[in-house]
Amino acid sequence: GDRIDYFKNSVAATLAHRAFCINLAYEFPAFGPDVWGITASDSERGYLAWGGPPRDPDIEGTIVPSAAGGSLMFTPELATKALETMHEKYGAKIYGKYGFVDAFNPKTGWVDTDVIGINAGIILLSAENMRTQNIWRWFMQNREIPLALQRVGLVKYNPSVRRPNAQDQSKRHHHELRSAGLR
């Protein structure tokens, strides 16, 4: 069958996630092109594993910085802009000793007081990987990883295999977003 480029798939997923969040701005004005991110996190009502699409009924305006921050290596400009804008708009309310808070809700003023390592960690790892690519390089130096990838059928990209060009992928991506009701 067709091979999947998981990097490009991650870029497309990040773009779809951002578009989904932008479309939430009609209900939650704090969301927009430069402030976006929904993923499992704390909320005023406790821990929630929200996401989308489709529109999860638990979405109530909480923004999770690690959702954008975890995509720094896939969409560096968009994810960096999101983190910078969150920091500029909300400052010390959402950024402290360990970096960004886990989650915050601009609509209600709620800010999580917990520091959740997996969410703080993904921002740190993604930033370092975006900057140096060391994280991926070190990961692949672990001898078990290439063997595991081979055993599950993941192979390196072969440029001699015909792949859709960027225009084809862009058209397909926009079609998928329209089909999902995001455009």
What are these model-predicted stretches?
Residues G1-R183:
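Ser/Thr/Asn(+Pro)-rich, low-complexity disordered segments
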